[in-house]
């Protein structure tokens, strides 16, 4: 991809809405974790030979590594949810929404580009602002809660109709975090080779 000028990409998993909400098959998180490890090793090896301006990166992997090594994450992986505060999405018709994953959900509309709209703030969507690891029963006792990047409120909103369930990738997080820690500890991958997207 770098040969074509693409340096940042996303290995996007499914958001549980539409047809993806019908879970006829279980996701094989072990195989998914193997794939993430392979991608991380590829990125590491590529970037090791490249100059920093030519580095490639994948959003979820770089965020997991930053979470482990720096204890930081970007807007889509933070708690409380930053939707409507630090991020806004614009639909094709000019409607504003708290998040690109919530476009079309009237509960999360902020108005329109041509009309009145809510000013982005933590108070714009109290339910999203109140959703944090400490308010989700399963998450508040999880040993991975401070490193887990799977905190997207839209995932649980579409899957359960509320904001107070663990993310559908909770099990994946429990698998991938120790694997990436092992890769970092053994120096198979180096955190400095994974810039944030």
Role assignments for model-derived ranges:
Residues 103-197:
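Flexible mid-to-C-terminal extensions adjoining Fe-S/redox cofactors in radical SAM and related proteins
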Residues 78-80, 84, 132, 160:
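Generic marker of residues within folded, mature protein domains
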Residues 56, 65, 69-74, 85, ...:
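Amphipathic, alpha-helical segments enriched in basic
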């Amino acid at each position: 991809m770098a040969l074509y000028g693409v340096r940042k990409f996303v290995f996007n998993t499914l958001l549980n809405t539409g047809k993806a909400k019908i879970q006829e098959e279980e996701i094989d998180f072990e195989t998914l974790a193997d794939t993430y490890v392979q991608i991380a090793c590829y990125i590491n090896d590529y970037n090791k030979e490249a100059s920093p301006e030519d580095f490639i990166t994948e959003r979820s992997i770089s965020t997991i590594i930053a979470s482990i090594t720096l204890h930081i994450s970007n807007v889509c992986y933070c708690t409380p949810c930053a939707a409507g505060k630090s991020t806004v999405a614009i639909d094709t018709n000019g409607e504003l929404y708290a998040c690109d994953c919530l476009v079309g959900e009237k509960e999360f509309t902020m108005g329109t580009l041509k009309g009145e709209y809510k000013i982005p703030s933590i108070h714009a969507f109290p339910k999203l602002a109140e959703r944090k690891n400490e308010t989700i029963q399963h998450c508040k006792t999880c040993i991975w809660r401070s490193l887990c990047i799977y905190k997207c409120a839209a995932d649980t909103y579409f899957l359960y109709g509320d904001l107070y369930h663990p993310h559908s990738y909770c099990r994946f997080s429990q698998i991938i975090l120790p694997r990436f820690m092992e890769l970092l500890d053994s120096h198979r991958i180096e955190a400095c080779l994974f810039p944030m997207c």
